[in-house]
Each structure stands twice: as C-alpha cells, then as structure tokens.
C-alpha cells in the first residue's frame, strides 16, 4: 500500500471507533441541539432581545458559532485524542495494523487524521445548520464560513490533539495528561486571556477576528501569523509523537528524519511567536521614535497656513496627492518645518515654478525656500507625494496599554484601525496627517505643537470608477468624474472618505441632513416608512435641544452620518473632547451601527409596540420613538457603561466618553483656545460649558462615590499635572478637568452674579 492509502486505512478505522464512542455522540447531540436553539433565538424567535452585532455584519454569524463550538471541542478533543493510546494498549484494538508493514508515521498520522476529520465533519454540520438559518436573513457571507473554519477550528484542533497525544506518550498517564491540559485551558481562558498580546490564546478568544463587510479583515498579517503559531506547533507535536511512538519501526533510523522535521516545525512556530511579539513591540518603539523626532523639531520655524489646495487621485493600492499650501511665516527663516505621515513618499516640493530642496526625517519635512523670509511674509509651496498611510504614527499621545486594550463587544473581538486603504475603499482622517501640516505632531516636551489655525480648504478628488468621495463642503462632480469640495467656513482640519456610497437626505432649517451608507446597506428606510415627513421635525428637535443645552448654534449647512468600517477606532485626548469619529459636518459611524442595539431598528419598532402593554401605540409612534432613541445617542456625554463586582458585594459602575457626542460640532470646530502654559485650557472650556462637574448623584448610589467625589479625593493627594499624566485615571480625566474648570471660573461667576 502507498503512504496515503495506509494513512486512509488507519484513519477510517479510527473514525469508526470515535463515532461509536458514546462520549462523542453525547457531545455531538448537545452541540447540534445548543447551536440549533441558539440560531433559532437569533434568527426566528421574536421574543428574544436580538443580537444586532451578530446579524448586522453577516460574517459575525459563523465567527460566533465556531467560537462557541471551538470551546467545547477543544476540551472534548483532549479526552478522545489521548484515549486511543490507552485503548490500543489496554484492549489491543489495533493489533490488525501492528502486524502490517506500516511505518510509525503512517500509523500515527492515520490515527490523528481519523480523530481530526470526525471533528471537522462536526464543524461542517454545525456550519450547515447555521447557514440554513442564516439564509432567512437573505445575506450570507459564504467566504466567512470558510475563513473562520480555517482560522478558528483547524489550528485549534491540530494543536490540542497533537499536544494531547504528545503528553500521553511523555507522561504515560492519561489522568495526569487530562489535569495538565484542562488546567492549561482554564489558565489561558480565565487568567492569561489577552496578556502578553494574546500570544497564548490558542482558541482565538482574544484575537481580533471581526471581518468588516466593507474592508474585510484589517489585520491579516497578525491573524495568519498568530494562527500559524498553533498550526505549526500542533504539527510539531504530531511529528514528535511519530518519533516517540512505542512500536517497532520499519527501519532502525526511520525516527531521525521525523525528529529533524519536528524540531524544524517547532522552531517555525517559535519564530511566528517571536514575530507576533516583536511586531507589537516594534509599534511601541517606532511610536517612541516619532515622538522623539517631534521633540527635536517642535521649536523650529513654522508657518501659519491659511489656504490649502488639495488634489487627490485614488489608486487601487495607494493614492497620489498634490497639495499647495499658502500661509504666513511665524518666524524669520529660510527653512520651515512641516509634518506628513511617514508612510507617504514625497517626490517633489516646488514654489513659483522652482524646485525646492527638502530634508525628510521620518514624519518631519524641512523645506528650504532658498532665501530667508521675514516674519509675516507670505509663503507658498506645492508638495507632490503618494503612498500608504502608516497607522503607527497615529495617536502618539495615547499610552501603549490603552492602544493595545481589547475592543470587545460580547465575544466579538474587533481590531482597531485609524485609516483604511483598499481597492474599493479609502478613509483618511486628520489624525493620519495625510496632507502636510505646519510644525510637528505630538510632542511630550513642548505644548506648542498643539497650536492650530483655521484654514480655507479646497479639495479635488478623482476616485476609482463607481466610487463616491465625501469630505467637508458641498461636493460637485464634473464631466471627467472629478469631485470638488469647498468648505463654507475656515476649518482646522480636513477628512476624506471614498467608497461605494449612496445618500438618504432631508432638509430641516436650511440644513441638509444626510446618511451616507454603502450600497446594499440600506436596512433602515423601510423601518421608518410611516414617518418620512416627520423626520425633519424630529431632527429639528434634536438640533434645538443641543443649542438650548449649551447656548451654541450648529454652524454648518450640512450634517452627515457616514458609514465606515467597524474597525475604525478613536480615543479621547487630554487637551480636547473631540474624537476622530466626529469631523466637521459629519460623524463617522460604524457599519450598520453594529455595536449599538438601538440600530436594530426593525426589531426596535416591534418592541415598542409589544412593550406598550395596555397603552397601545400606532406604528408611526413606534417608529418615532425608535428614531428618537437613535438621535439621543448623539446628545449623551457618556458612551459605554461597565458594571463590575466591587468589594463586599457592591457593584461598581464606570463609563467611557461617547465618541459620537455632537458637542465638538458646535464648539471645537468653530473655536479654539490655546495656552502654552495650560495645554488643557481648551478642554477646561469645553467641560465648563457642559457643566461636567454636576449631575452624578445616581452614580453615588451604585459606587458609593460619584466620579466627581473620586476626582476631589485625588486632587487632595496629587497635583493637577500628575493626574493628567496618570494613565490609570483616564476614566476620571473629564471629572478632574471639569472640577478645576469650575474652580477657575467660580470667582468670575460670583462677580457677574451668575
């Protein structure tokens, strides 16, 4: 018999024995029953609360199901895989193979393949059941079923089966093997979790695996490398098992090649593990380098740019841009400092038709204008560059532990990205420094880098065929497919999003309100069919409520909610409450609002009718309530609330800032206060206007202390500056700054009789 046919013969025999096992049969029945019931609740039952993050993004359905199945089969595989060695020895179940001229490799691989293929068949059955239910939604991501099967189930099964059999041969004790492996599983799931950058997460619980319906996976290299660790380690244990197997080999030297192969495979697994850690640590190192370079150039001469002319041409793999800046010299010099994302390559810089010399130091661009310009002189320069954005340059002020913290919604682990660039999608926000800006980015030595100015922006964009660009200002398209944008007012920054967008819009008080969604992502229009004429009135109420509360009016002629990939992440800064999710005139909202249960609008309308009880409400009223709940999200200062167990059985409540809070639209994008001595001056004004230091009595009832009381206690023990630099107090930073702002303005309020 050939090598393959021998393996198939052994595998066939082993598979039959495994299928006849009552242990496996019980697990199969339980798995099928539980998964079927879960799918029924998810797709069919109207009494369930809904699970919008799973159904909004079709790829999340196989992700969730296989993750749940993976937990059970990883435990069961330990018992069943290690059992065949005990069974062979105790019951002589494989004597028929021992007398045949089989190599140890054929026998061991056949045994393991026999176990593995039964589990893989169970996975296929579970996926088929899930896909059948999934078809009721009308939107199935078939590729996601295959990818998650290969990324979650296959590496886990190969690793745990190979490790179990290897330990059985080494320890020669099944009970001890069970104890060690079950302890290992418990340790990785409940204690280690995502520690050490989720290196030990062999079941893929902490690995960011959410696949966007817009850009797909945003961290392919991390995923393949991480799953490769356990796939290769599992193969290495299988090869070690062949060389250690207690059976006379066909040749006295036949074990040596397998030892060499096993060591080489194990080394490859270690290399993948090393690369996983190294790539993450490299991000921290390069970020420190970028900050160090900013510190070096933060005090060099720069200019105030009051006019930008930008031209962007989208390519499948990158983008080409030509930017002309015009401004005023703030210092007397011939060389001025600019900052541009280090992933972008500058091809030329010229002014008035003359090529200018420039020096590039990572993100810093030093442009030599040839002659010295006096302070106040008008200067212009044109930059031509292309490339891809380096995301590691973003958020240099955010501590590594915050950047590396998991972004988890239930069991769904979402990657965090700050820009996107694929053949069908492009998203660039100001944080990426996708166009040259005067001075440097974040410096931890000198706050002068924070000083920003309002500039006039004109933007021309040539997208790929069939795609629509979005930016600040009204977009106009010419006959050649080039879009032009010009803002109504000077702005501090500019953003650009290009995708296969469609628009739903309504006018209210001469302002154009729009929802820009990706093609085939309009799941909400039908749920508001009874209130199309009422929506402008509801929007007007939200706008007026925002103006009444903060005594500031919305200044722009447009407001858009733009659908972006779910992996897009932002952070609150020490000097401003504005996050990248909120841009002038627009909010960048996760695809289909997947992370918010309020966005399951179809179910929400039904729930409002069902929950009305004796006070029956009309379909129109239910739709109005659903719309109002959605709009309310943009008026809340807090985002997620997290409940945890405290000491002596008390609960503990913590909250994070709402990244979609609209306050920056009426304050940050129209006003800016800067002080080199008080870098948080602008933040203090924000929080003073919001009266952040008030209205938290209900938190005291849960925590025993409100966040303001906690902040007061901290201010008694530490200085204001120390608390701003303390990463552990980030959740209380608003309260700390708000209390200081209230104290700062208290005397003025008394003098004015406020």
Predicted regions and their residues:
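Hydrophobic alpha-helical transmembrane segments of multi-pass membrane transport/permease proteins
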Residues: 20-45, 67-77, 180-189
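Hydrophobic helix-coil surface modules that form long, contiguous segments used
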Residues: 24-40, 265-271, 446-663, 672-730
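Long, hydrophobic alpha-helical segments
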Residues: 61-87, 122, 323, 383
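A surface-exposed beta-strand-loop module
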Residues: 332-335, 342-407, 445-448, 480, ...
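Terminal transmembrane helical anchor/hairpin motif
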Residues: 42-57, 174-253, 275-292
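Selective transmembrane-helix segments that form parts of the transport pathway or gating/packing helices
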Residues: 23, 27, 73, 102-133
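Extended, low-hydrophobicity, Ser/Thr/Pro/Gly-biased non-transmembrane segments
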Residues: 384-501
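N-terminal, polar/Ser/Thr-rich
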Residues: 199-208, 216-225, 253-319, 347, ...
């Amino acid at each position: 018999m050939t090598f393959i046919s021998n393996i198939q013969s052994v595998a066939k025999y082993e598979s039959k024995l495994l299928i006849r096992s009552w242990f496996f049969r019980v697990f199969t029945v339980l798995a099928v029953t539980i998964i079927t019931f879960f799918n029924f609740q998810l797709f069919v039952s109207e009494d369930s609360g809904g699970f919008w993050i799973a159904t909004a993004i079709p790829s999340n359905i196989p992700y969730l199901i296989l993750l749940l199945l993976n937990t059970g089969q990883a435990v069961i595989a330990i018992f069943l895989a290690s059992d065949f060695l005990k069974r062979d020895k105790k019951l002589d179940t494989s004597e028929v193979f021992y007398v045949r001229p089989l190599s140890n490799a054929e026998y061991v691989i056949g045994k393991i393949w026999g176990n593995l293929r039964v589990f893989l068949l169970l996975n296929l059955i579970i996926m088929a059941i899930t896909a059948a239910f999934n078809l009721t939604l009308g939107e199935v991501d078939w590729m996601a079923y295959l990818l998650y099967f290969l990324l979650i189930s296959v590496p886990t099964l190969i690793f745990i089966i190979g490790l179990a059999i290897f330990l059985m041969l080494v320890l020669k004790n099944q009970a001890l093997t069970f104890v060690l492996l079950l302890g290992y599983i418990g340790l990785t799931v409940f204690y280690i979790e995502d520690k050490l950058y989720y290196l030990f997460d062999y079941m893929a619980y902490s690995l960011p695996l959410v696949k966007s319906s817009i850009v797909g996976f945003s961290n392919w290299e991390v995923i393949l490398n991480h799953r490769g660790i356990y796939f290769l380690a599992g193969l290495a244990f299988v090869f070690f098992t062949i060389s250690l197997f207690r059976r006379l080999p066909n040749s006295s030297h036949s074990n040596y090649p397998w030892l060499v192969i096993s060591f080489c495979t194990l080394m490859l697994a270690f290399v993948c593990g090393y690369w996983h850690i190294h790539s993450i640590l490299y991000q921290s190192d390069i970020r420190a380098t970028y900050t160090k370079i900013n510190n070096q150039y933060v005090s060099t001469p720069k200019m105030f740019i009051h006019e930008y002319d930008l031209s962007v041409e989208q390519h499948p793999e990158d983008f080409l841009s030509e930017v002309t800046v015009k401004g005023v010299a703030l210092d007397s010099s011939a060389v001025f400092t600019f900052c541009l994302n280090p992933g972008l390559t500058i091809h030329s810089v010229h002014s008035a038709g003359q090529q200018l010399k420039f020096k590039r130091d990572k993100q810093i661009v030093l442009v030599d204008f040839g002659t010295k310009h006096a302070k106040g002189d008008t200067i212009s320069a044109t930059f031509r560059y292309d490339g891809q954005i380096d995301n590691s340059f973003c958020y240099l002020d955010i501590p590594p532990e915050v950047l590396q913290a998991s972004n988890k919604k239930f069991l769904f682990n979402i990657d965090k990205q700050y820009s996107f660039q694929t053949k069908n999608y492009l998203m660039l926000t100001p944080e990426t420094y996708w166009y040259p800006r005067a001075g440097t980015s974040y410096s931890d030595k000198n706050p002068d880098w924070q000083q920003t100015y309002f500039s006039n922006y004109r933007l021309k964009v040539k997208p790929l065929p069939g795609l629509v660009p979005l930016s600040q200002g009204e977009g106009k398209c010419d006959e050649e497919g080039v879009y032009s944008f010009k803002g109504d007012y000077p702005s501090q920054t500019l953003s650009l999003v290009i995708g296969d967008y469609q628009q739903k819009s309504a006018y209210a008080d001469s302002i154009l309100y729009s929802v820009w969604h990706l093609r085939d992502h309009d799941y909400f229009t039908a749920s508001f069919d009874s209130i199309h004429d009422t929506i402008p009135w509801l929007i007007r109420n939200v706008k007026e409520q925002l103006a009444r509360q903060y005594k500031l009016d919305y200044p722009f002629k447009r407001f858009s909610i733009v659908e972006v990939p779910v992996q897009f992440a932002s952070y609150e800064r020490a000097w401003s409450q504005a996050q990248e999710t909120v841009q002038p005139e627009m909010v960048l909202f996760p695809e289909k609002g997947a992370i918010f249960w309020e966005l399951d609008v179809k179910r929400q309308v039904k729930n409002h009718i069902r929950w009305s009880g004796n006070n029956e409400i009309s379909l129109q009223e239910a739709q109005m309530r659903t719309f109002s709940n959605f709009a309310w999200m943009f008026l809340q200062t807090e985002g997620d609330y997290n409940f945890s167990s405290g000491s002596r059985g008390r609960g503990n409540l913590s909250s994070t800032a709402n990244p979609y809070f609209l306050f920056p639209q009426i304050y940050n994008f129209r006003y800016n206060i800067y002080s080199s001595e008080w870098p948080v001056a602008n933040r203090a004004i924000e929080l003073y206007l919001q009266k952040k230091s008030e209205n938290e009595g209900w938190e005291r009832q849960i925590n025993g202390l409100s966040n303001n009381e906690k902040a007061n206690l901290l201010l008694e023990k530490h200085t204001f500056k120390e608390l701003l630099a303390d990463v552990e107090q980030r959740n209380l930073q608003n309260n700390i700054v708000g209390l200081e702002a209230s104290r700062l303005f208290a005397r003025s309020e008394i003098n004015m009789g406020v």
